[in-house]
């Protein structure tokens, strides 16, 4: 068949083709493969030749253009004609079973594939694609790709790159791309991970071109047309035809004709058709398969349209006037159509008979003879209007001299009388015939709109302007589309697929149209208002420009023919999706139906709701239920029973499954509860879960200290430091003036009076001062007066002193800044540890059970929260590091200064502890404060500043792990064990007591009455009668003494540490040898915290045996010359451990006080006492300091204060030097024999007459006393937070109490006030201020009575101990006043004056104080190694 849109080049090799139907003798349909071309009906006969026909050369190669019937005996037609073209295949001849000649592939070149490769790929593609399909299936493509021998992984990558649409099949451009990638892989070239943009754009354009060229279904074309009935009758013909036509022409037998056309008369009437494209559009050659010539791509059909065809004789050229081009006379009649066609005679018959050349049933028979005035006839089943197929005198071909009327051979344009119309639906581009006559200027438009052309718009308008055609539609033809696409690709150089608005305006502006027209065109093209145009939208705009240049009016709306297919497809998809969603979610309203109403055909729509069928089935079942028979009803009943049984079975199964699920869920819940409980217990045991409120309180307290209090302190320190510098410079100047009376110092910068803000010296002040000095010198030079100093040495000394003072001030300032930085670091660390990471709502939800279900809340409340806190309390009760509660901490602030002065022995923790090792918030807070204080004191130590507190030689005490106390029965030991322990202790003490004699003792510090106190950095004002040089000498001497004392303390610290290590080893050996279980290893803890694990009761009766009393008397009598220093620390060494106090037979190294019963403990009182013992101040900071240089020596001021409190009513101790006291004590202590251990006698009942002195006075004095457990005085409270720049207290040692006599108990003193029947309650809180304390009692004028037994003073209500024994008898009157300390049982001396270290309120009640000391449960036992007196490190300290 000839396609008018295919134009091959001359000499191009073409494949043979056959475009007609071949009939055999029986009328059957056959498609043989012929190698030659025949121009009419002929049969090949090897023996018979027609004499009148000679072959002629027409420049074309032979080509079969009609129905060729293979015969083996004769030929009746024409001779073979050479047409100049090689045989070619046009898609209508099946050369082999594998080649799909019907497949239409656009003639588009892929730039990345060579032309030869693309032709090979196309041939391979045609052989693999079945007829009726346009894409190769995945299986077929897989088989082809596997032939390359590549691994499957590589082929899978190639497939993913080639299948651009992800459809599972490949169109030709995708198939060619896959083969090209295979070639690259075979050449060992790497495959691209993503297709290059150029390749992707070309392949996508090729795919779009194939999608646009898909023909329409003939059934859809015939729908709603008068030819619909004819189309349905010939469905078999459509099925039998090689391909479906889409033009208005039927196959003709006399020329190159499209398939599926009914045969025409082959005699004298040949329908003219357009076969070469005419003079309209020169088309490029291309191969198609069974598609129409009007709107399809061009194909090579053999003839070249530009070459004018010469007329040729197609009949007999002899004398025969006319010939039959059908069958020759010797042949029998045959059917030239399908089987139902009637036979016709094709021999020589002057009056030729009519023969059917088309489809017989619908067509009327036509005469094949000579009929000049032939009428137009319908040539096939088509939706188009009929066209004239008779003789039309047109074209350039000369009429043939065959006896027939001249006719066109089909190579000229169609008659202009036919109206061109689109053959597809509106909006489907490329299926529109070019308007007859054409619209001019298309080629000029293509050249005008290219990017590099600079042509005037007048040239373009002159090329346009053809006469308006009324039969021209808005549809875009293939030729126009190709031109528009070429312009688009020329402008879209980056291959983005879009042209922006600016570029489009420049392109459209070349047309010379008015601005309103261009705006209208843009609005019509860019319907989505994107601001840019894709290829289809650009084609629409260019088409509108083209039509407007030809005089057409622009439409107000975009015609349906111009709607881009891509946009239409997207819109249709969106509409269908919306309809499906609307129909699926929203049920249509039920409308009243009636049989009289018009019913829509459901087959017309693509989506049919299932609700319609459901409605029909419901109505049918409802209507038929009334007419069901009995058998049907029984059947329904049986079916319903079966359904009910099935439902019951399902219910049972579901119930079983649900029961299993419930059981499984319950097990899971229990398992989770158990895991939660384990985690909770783990958290409680580790102590990680601190209270949120406690953390908030501690954090607030920390911020108050660091943000409010600390900045003020630092500011005050800076002020004092500046004042010290200025005073030092003034003192140096005055000293030099006194030493050199004739020396007149020159005014220095310090004499400049500043006039700036805050008295600052400005530049103006300096200039003014210099000018004054210069003027003064000049005046002195004129008058000869003396202007300044002539002694340069003195000036140098002054400058040096001034510089030293400034340097010292700078150093102090830097130290303060370092301390401030350390405080900031400590603050950050504390804040990070105290900041709560738990949200408040989460805490309320998971800790208190708020906002959760009742079951979860009940489980949360059932968690053992109290157990963790109870364990924490027990641990804190047993731990020697117990921290006070908030109220106790506040109450203990007022007693810190007293405890600082009385506690001096500090021990070292056995193991280093960390923050995470403490289980309670109090312990962690204590650890944080201990670390903070340690760092603070490190900074303060550099300045020589120490806070007024107890001194020690170890690091700040931190809490340690609690130690469980053994049971009472484990503590009780027989007397033999106790005796053995005493023996071991004596030997150890003798060894340890001899050691201090070898240790160098620092020189005695002058007492407060003999030596001035160590001055602070601020130099005190000198007395008026003292000279300046004496003040300076005293200052330098004090400074030198301070430095020497620091060196001594450092050396003493090292020696003391070594001695303590030795003592520790000895004690460990001693305790290892004991059979009694030891409750805790003696450790050196901070003196600010007691080491007891049990609370301390307010009173405890500790009676002494007669043997002990006699031993004490002997010991005292043998040492009449003993100094008070020997026995001063004994009240402090009375302490015993809690376990020993609970055991009446436990060993105690103190011969004075041995417990005989287990007292009742009051936790609140014990906590208050521990607070005071720890030395907690008002700011909750501990007083322990490891690196303070002033902590190395003994707190002699504390010892003096303790001695004054204990023995204020006795004779004042002698002012002996400390060295002598220590030496004497050392010697005398070594000579003291150990007391004999005697079993204690039974406790007698306390007689009512034996009453101690009144307690009221003691309790009143206790408020103002300076003891360890009492409320501090006003001076002590005020001195609590002060910084001490030296030990300013008198280092006098406190005397020990007199021993209890062993004689008979005398009659009670009659003038003693009666004792109250009930003991007044001890103070529950130590927060009482000094104002609340009662006034001190007057100094007694008579000799005070002997102290009663302390245990009888503080019995508790819950105490189950036996009544207290009677007090010991008073000693007999001595012959003379005993030497101090009065230890003999003589009459008490006269009332002495209060000692300087005593409290301002007078002598305290010694009995009450001794009762509290002996009642302390936290005092541990002390071996002989620590009972020595000469050691300065333990003087006046309470041993923990």
Swiss-Prot record:
Listed GO CC annotations: actin cortical patch; endosome membrane; plasma membrane
Segments forming domain EH: 117-206, 480-569
Biased composition (Basic and acidic residues): 867-876, 921-984, 1038-1067, 1101-1112, 1218-1230, 1420-1430
Region (Disordered): 1-67, 234-285, 297-428, 564-629, 861-1440
Isomerase as UniProt keyword: no
Recorded topology in the membrane: Peripheral membrane protein
Entry-linked SMART domains: EFh (SM00054), EH (SM00027)
Start-end of Pro residues biased regions: 1232-1255, 1311-1324, 1333-1353, 1362-1402
Pfam families: DUF1720 (PF08226), EH (PF12763)
Gene3D superfamilies with a match to the protein in the record: EF-hand
Compositional bias of kind Low complexity: 39-63, 385-398, 882-914, 1140-1155
UniProt-listed InterPro entries: DUF1720, EF-hand-dom_pair, EF_hand_dom, EH_dom, WH2_dom
Family, similarity comment: Belongs to the PAN1 family.
Quaternary assembly: Component of the PAN1 actin cytoskeleton-regulatory complex.
Function noted in UniProt: Component of the PAN1 actin cytoskeleton-regulatory complex required for the internalization of endosomes during actin-coupled endocytosis. The complex links the site of endocytosis to the cell membrane-associated actin cytoskeleton. Mediates uptake of external molecules and vacuolar degradation of plasma membrane proteins. Plays a role in the proper organization of the cell membrane-associated actin cytoskeleton and promotes its destabilization.
Protein name per Swiss-Prot or TrEMBL: Actin cytoskeleton-regulatory complex protein PAN1
Gene that this polypeptide is encoded by: PAN1
